[in-house]
A protein has these predicted regions:
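Secreted/periplasmic carbohydrate-active enzymes, especially glycoside hydrolases
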Residues: 1-240, 279-280, 294-295, 311-317, ...
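Substrate-binding/catalytic cleft of secreted carbohydrate-active enzymes
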Residues: 207-210, 217-437
């Protein structure tokens, strides 16, 4: 806007279009609302400015060390320095100095004689025994990037950095060398009172609620989520599939009996290519430094075609540290390399087994399953247990987290929630978007209890004399939990004891009851594993 403003008072006018040509690419199942749903920021930048930074990582095979590179783009002439993990060391670029913590720091000069407006400056640091980021242990470092001009600080940026490696090896998705299982949900951005504008307090509630119910992953269905939500996923520990703002199911569902794709968007239509790829680039460039994002998704229910394949290739070229997801390859197998994993929706477990027997080349996830409309989710354990029977099956994402109801008051003054058709809208999908685990005002339904049990990281089986505990965590020992043993007879509490036990991730421990069950009456033993609080670890104290 620099060329448009002038000294003194300026008037800024914003015109918001309800529909545009891009609306053809936004056929998601949600309320059609108009306006500005997120914060808009107007800012000035100094003469020397950090235009961009991309944090890249590599690790020793045993994760005993890490190499962290900050690729910075700077406009203007000045000095740029990077402080990593709270302390700065001065050194020329390319000659880093090492200090006792094992982290290497650098300081570089942006060349004022370079003619280009933007200059590239890179810093590489070595970290010994890095604290790795995961949903179980969301450890974050702090990087501070400072730009100086004429001996004065012109700009300072603080960036949380999570160190982790996500990869595809031997047909399995691995996080920090361990096979991951996604115990996830799909989440639309929704508030029953403010529509598609979600407050920070509501986002924080969602993250805490998901963590409290053993959910470890979120698919941002079907568009990039608010950056603050991604920040919360970094801090509290949730794995994220970052999804491109693309869905055109209304066009590809018109495929003819002969399989012609004259209706499908984007397909291979050249007029849509740039618009589609621009959406992918915008998401990646905005969100690329969030450790929570493990997978880029090409969108939802947009069939297939060369354009989507080109999007996947863009993701792989621009960011090799993440995998690429697209469920549409199940429907259109002409571009199978679009997705690094097989992905389906609402497939019964028996059919998943049959598919993997015939197509064992890639790992498999359910990007949508266990449709949570009404009194549902009763069969979820069939899926969660299968993830520990078949290594290629690596979990899924429940559809969906929240009911999309609008808070209203009826003529009698009674509060409630409206859905499709309640405003005289015809045709209507009626209650089709009221299909969540929580109500529109974020109250949990009994379905959340079923999810909490099915997604539990500990599988506890009781005999007459002991508890057999299978630790399904990737990185957390059983000693992190309080094990509470409580006995009852005919429903009346009898004895209670708490203990700790060691059991490494992936192993099973047999723990004798701390006291015997009464022989008379209907005796029952209950074992509860309690892990206190949502872990949020950050060296800079966000």
């Amino acid at each position: 806007m620099t060329a448009a403003v002038h000294p003194g008072e300026n008037t800024l006018t914003v015109q918001v279009y309800r529909f545009s040509s891009g609306s053809w690419l936004e056929d998601q199942d949600f309320w059609r609302m108009s306006g500005l749903f997120r914060s808009v920021e107007l800012f000035t930048k100094p003469e020397v400015h950090l235009e961009d930074v991309f944090v890249k990582q590599s690790f020793a095979d045993d994760f005993s060390s890490a190499t962290v590179t900050f690729d910075c783009k700077v406009s203007g002439a000045g000095t740029i320095s990077v402080v990593f993990d709270g302390e700065e060391q001065s050194a020329a670029v390319g000659e880093p100095a090492e200090y006792d913590s094992g982290v290497v720091f650098g300081k570089g000069e942006a060349d004022p004689d370079v003619e280009e407006d933007v200059q590239d400056v890179s810093f590489t640091f070595a970290v010994t025994n890095p604290a790795l980021w995961s949903a179980e242990e969301p450890s974050l470092y702090t990087a501070e990037i400072c730009l100086e001009q004429g001996g004065s600080v012109a700009e300072r940026t603080e960036l949380p950095v999570g160190l982790r490696r996500f990869e595809l090896r031997d047909r399995q998705m691995l996080l920090n060398g361990k096979r991951i299982v996604f115990q996830g949900v799909n989440r639309h951005e929704w508030s029953c009172r403010t529509g598609r504008t979600v407050s920070r307090e509501e986002m924080e509630w969602d993250v805490r609620n998901l963590k409290a119910h053993n959910v470890n992953a979120v698919r941002t269905s079907h568009y990039p989520n608010d950056p603050y939500f991604l920040h919360l996923c970094d801090v509290y520990g949730l794995y994220v599939i970052g999804e491109t703002n693309l869905e055109s199911h209304g066009t590809w569902q018109k495929l003819g009996a002969d399989g012609s794709d004259e209706w499908t968007l984007p397909g291979a239509r050249p007029e849509w290519r740039d618009a589609v790829l621009a959406r992918a680039e915008a998401m990646l460039e905005r969100d690329k430094n969030h450790p929570a994002i493990l997978i880029w998704s090409c969108g939802n229910e947009s069939h297939g075609g060369r354009t989507l394949w080109e999007m996947s290739q863009y993701f792989r070229t621009a960011d090799p540290s993440r995998l690429v997801h697209y469920e549409g390859i199940f429907w259109d197998r002409t571009w199978p390399d679009t997705s690094d994993m097989e992905s389906q929706m609402y497939t019964p477990v028996a059919d998943i087994k049959k598919f993997l027997a015939e197509h064992p080349e890639k790992p498999f996830i359910m990007c949508e399953y266990s449709h949570a409309m009404g009194n549902s989710c009763g069969g979820i354990t069939d899926y969660t247990e299968y993830a520990y029977e078949e290594l290629l099956y690596q979990g899924g994402f429940i559809w969906e987290y929240m009911d999309h109801g609008i808070a209203v008051t009826d003529p009698d003054g009674k509060p409630g929630f409206a859905y499709g058709g309640d405003f005289g809208d015809r045709p209507t999908d009626r209650e089709f978007c009221v299909d969540g685990l929580v109500l529109p005002d974020r109250r949990n339904t009994p379905k959340m209890d079923a999810v909490k049990a099915a997604y539990a990281p500990l599988k506890i089986t009781l005999t007459d004399t002991e508890a057999v505990i299978e630790n399904r965590n990737l990185f957390t020992d059983l000693s992190a939990y309080d094990l509470v043993f409580a006995s009852s007879v005919t429903g009346k509490p009898q004895r209670r004891a708490m203990l700790r036990a060691d059991c490494k991730p992936g192993e099973t421990e047999h723990i004798p009851f701390p006291f015997a069950l009464p022989e008379a009456g209907l005796a029952c033993m209950t074992v509860t594993a309690v892990q206190w609080g949502c872990k949020a670890r950050h060296s800079g104290g966000l």
